[in-house]
From Swiss-Prot:
Pathway: Isoprenoid biosynthesis; isopentenyl diphosphate biosynthesis via DXP pathway; isopentenyl diphosphate from 1-deoxy-D-xylulose 5-phosphate: step 1/6. Disulfide bonds: none annotated. Mn(2+) binds at residues 149, 151, 220. 1-deoxy-D-xylulose 5-phosphate binds at residues 124, 150-151, 175, 198, 211, 216-217, 220. The keyword Coiled coil does not apply. Belongs to the DXR family. This is 1-deoxy-D-xylulose 5-phosphate reductoisomerase.
Length: 383
């Protein structure tokens, strides 16, 4: 029985993780559920999975959760980052699923690694912000980091049984998002409703907007750079609208390996939870004859400048990826609040990056300072 702490239990990845846990309740149990808010959903999860601990963002939310739990509930309720870090460090926990959105997941994920827990990583911002620090700490502690992102799971699977010294290139696939065939003018004036309507995946609001700008793919480039220890120039993005091939790797002999599956996050989640084994999800493999054709083409950086900004930050290293991430979070939040138009998102990020002086070999404190500076600066650029 593998015992789990789930960071971000009420989000899309969290909900799908609990579906996998429910299906394989003889193999997994839940020790702690952690969320920001979404009290009603979290209360339902607590009553269903009976964890020893539930953690939310602050004291009022904790009180609201307690009021929704039945009298005599065995689940302790804590709040704040200290609560999240306690949840990942519980002695009985074998694996932490890191699925919090954004920078909020960094501290708890580092705490999990320090506690020697295996980490199933869905929060790409953890590596975007502090990739070198996190990977070095994981190596020091002997802690496996298993990717949940479908693309990084695909790369991880394609690398199995192969010596990485023979790797030539990583090919990250992108669906192209809801604006794949839209003009630049149509993209710049898009509404939140239009940007949230992803053609392939059902996701949370923030990652849906990142998918619409292609910033999500840019963050995945940076994540891949650290997770697989390859330079930015060894990673390329290719648009693949069918989302059947989740990523590919090519080797120095000209061969290429790809991982295919129907678009369903439960596959990547189950693989991370059960690695090196595989679970029978009762999910059919892609019907190649029915697909008829799979298409690929290069992304248009003129219409989707966020991807180019992410590659730039990845190449510049230092604290630029952390600044990119922070400025993006602020700009996306402003767009969702309808404070800025969609086309303003990359311009805010570009200006913040242009004003930043990168810190070489940054400490965790340097990264947090850069994150805070970028949020303040991006906020100052908003109406």
């Amino acid at each position: 029985m593998k015992r789990l702490t789930l960071l971000g239990s009420t989000g899309s990845i969290g909900v799908n993780t609990l579906k996998v846990v429910s299906r394989f309740c003889d193999r997994f149990s839940v020790e702690a559920l952690c969320a920001r808010g979404s009290v009603d959903t979290l209360a339902e999860q607590v009553q269903r999975f009976s964890p020893s601990l539930a953690v939310v963002i602050d004291a009022p939310t904790a009180q609201a959760l307690k009021e929704r739990l039945p009298a005599g509930s065995r689940t302790e309720v804590l709040f704040g980052e200290a609560g999240y870090c306690h949840a990942v460090s519980l002695p009985g926990v074998d694996m932490v699923v890191s699925a919090m959105v954004g920078a909020a997941g960094l501290g708890p994920t580092i705490a999990a690694i320090k506690a020697g827990k295996a980490v199933a990583l869905a929060n790409k911002e953890v590596l975007v912000m502090a990739g070198e620090t996190v990977m070095a700490l994981a190596a020091q502690k002997g802690v496996p980091l298993l990717p949940i992102d479908s693309e990084h799971s695909a790369i991880f699977q394609c690398l199995q049984g192969n010596d990485k010294t023979f790797l030539s290139k990583i090919h990250l696939t992108a669906s192209g998002g809801p604006f794949l065939n839209k003009t630049r003018q149509e993209i710049e004036t898009a509404t939140p409703e239009q940007a949230l309507a992803h053609p392939t995946w059902t996701m949370g609001k923030k990652i849906s907007i990142d998918s619409a700008t292609l910033m999500n793919k840019g963050l995945e480039v940076i994540e891949a750079r650290f997770l697989f220890d390859v330079p930015a120039d060894c990673i390329e993005v290719v648009v693949h609208p069918q989302s059947i091939i989740h990523s590919m790797v090519s080797y120095i002999d000209g061969s290429m390996m790809a991982q295919l599956s129907v678009p369903d996050m439960k596959g990547a989640i189950a693989y991370a939870l059960s690695y090196p084994e595989r679970l029978d999800l009762n999910q059919p493999a892609p019907d190649l004859a029915a697909l008829e054709q799979l298409t690929f083409f290069s992304p248009d950086l003129d219409r989707f400048p966020c991807l180019g900004l992410a590659f730039e930050a990845c190449r510049r290293k230092k604290t630029f990826p952390a600044v990119l991430n922070a400025a993006n979070e602020v700009a996306v939040d402003a767009f969702l609040r309808e404070a800025i138009p969609f086309g303003r998102i990359p311009r805010v990020i570009e200006q913040v990056l242009a004003e930043h002086t990168g810190v070489t070999d940054p400490s965790l404190s340097d990264i947090k300072d850069a994150d805070a500076w970028a949020r303040q600066r991006a906020g100052a650029l908003l109406p």
